[in-house]
Amino acid sequence: MPSRKKLHLISLGCTKNLVDSEVMLGRLKEYEITDDNTEADVIIVNTCGFIDAAKEESINTVLNLHDERKEDSILVMSGCLSERYKEELQQDMPEIDIFTGVGDYEKIDELIASKQSTFSPEVYLATETSGRVITGSNYHAYIKIAEGCNQACSFCAIPSFKGKLHSRSLSSIEKEVRMLAEQGYYDFSFISQDSSSYGRDMDLKDGLIDLIKVVEAIEGVRSARILYLYPSTTTFELIDTIADSKIFQTYYDMPIQHIDDAVLKTMKRGFGEQKTIELLEHMKSKPNAFLRTSVIAGHPGESQRSFEKLCSFMEEFGFDRFNTFHYSNEETTTAYQMEQIPQDIINERAEILGEIAERSTLRSLEKMVGKTVELVIDGESDEHEYLLSARPLQWAVDIDGEILINDTSDLPVKYGKVYEAKVTELVGMQLLATLIKEC
């Protein structure tokens, strides 16, 4: 019997990209997955084209894999970078055997068989029939609820290659979640470019609220959270619905990008300082709420005074987590033609915001000491073989950190199972906890 061909796949960028990578894995089940790229018959890099750093990572990854690939292997470049720069890349990168963008993930097996590059005009949106292979977890899955975005933020090129908002039907989402719940998945993260706009293209007034109600009724779903809310499409009613839900975590991930009115106007965010703060305060007023956001350092028009105002707000408000992005000047965006802030000033501002973010996270972690939390054990810790890595169910996967279990109370430990635990201490930026019981 001939040995199976081997596949090496790297998924770069966001979790939305990961879902598309999982669709490709589902179409290539006859291949054996290998971590060793030098022995792979097919190598796929699902690229990110969001900002300069991501573009650079994508190109470097592809070129490094090409240098190490075995003879007669097939190298595929898919995803956002490939879509965004399809003409230039096909001309400048003869190392690549197959180029494909954001429309053909479900046809990847056909493209490899015919060794043909294709760019479909429609953006692909995974459904319950995609046959994706969930990676990295036996209990958690990302559910993509929409593609594209109707916002017109000055700094963002995503609508230029992902198009307008295109939502999945509620029944499609319900079927996928139900199917995964029947397979034992119980924790779900709902994602898109602008999740709070979900359903607006289908004339659903409160699409996300409708989705919450549907998911709450699915047997086997224990926990869920929504990522990527957008201020101008987030309502007080949505905030209340999330807080009142028995299934959805009181978890608010809403990138604000800035807080100064003048900068927000230049960014074309559609919401000013006052309305943004009203939303954030309403979120923060909910019992045990967790708030995550992101900001941009050095957008054109950000004066020193605007920046200092942002710093003061981020220091004082009390976010549990926030990310800082260096402003990246992207062609096809309206900010591209604006007068740019020097890179050294952008770097300096981003560093200051990064330090504020660390202090903000530390204060959030300190509040957890002494609390009893529900957490799921993911496996042995990378820090120490005698410690276990766990994640509170409220936190998002990968981005919010881990809690280390240093005392199991002699309970039988099962990876992927939920336990009640008491957080006992904070060492540096690392929380430690003791298991109390299996839930």
UniProtKB/Swiss-Prot annotation:
Q: Give residues annotated as binding [4Fe-4S] cluster 2.
A: 149, 153, 156
Q: Which reaction does it catalyse?
A: L-aspartate(89)-[ribosomal protein uS12]-hydrogen + (sulfur carrier)-SH + AH2 + 2 S-adenosyl-L-methionine = 3-methylsulfanyl-L-aspartate(89)-[ribosomal protein uS12]-hydrogen + (sulfur carrier)-H + 5'-deoxyadenosine + L-methionine + A + S-adenosyl-L-homocysteine + 2 H(+)
Give the record's keywords alphabetically.
4Fe-4S, Cytoplasm, Iron, Iron-sulfur, Metal-binding, S-adenosyl-L-methionine, Transferase
What's a Pfam family in this record?
A: UPF0004
Identify which cofactors the protein needs according to its UniProt entry. [4Fe-4S] cluster
Start and end residues of each MTTase N-terminal domain: 5-117
GO biological process per UniProt? tRNA modification
Its Enzyme Commission number(s) read: 2.8.4.4
Which InterPro entries does the record associate with it?
A: Elp3/MiaA/NifB-like_rSAM, Methylthiotransferase, Methylthiotransferase_CS, Methylthiotransferase_N, Methylthiotransferase_N_sf, NA-bd_OB-fold, Ribosomal_uS12_MeSTrfase_RimO, rSAM
Instruction: Specify where it is mainly localized.
Output: cytoplasm
Entry binding sites for [4Fe-4S] cluster 1 = 14, 48, 80
Mention one GO molecular function.
metal ion binding
User: Which residue range or ranges hold the TRAM domain?
Assistant: 366-437
Domain called Radical SAM core: residue spans:
135-363
Name where it's found.
Answer: Cytoplasm
What is the top EC class of this enzyme, as a single word? transferase
Please explain the role this protein plays, according to its UniProt record.
Catalyzes the methylthiolation of an aspartic acid residue of ribosomal protein uS12.
Q: What is this protein called?
A: Ribosomal protein uS12 methylthiotransferase RimO
Name its species.
Answer: Sulfurovum sp. (strain NBC37-1)
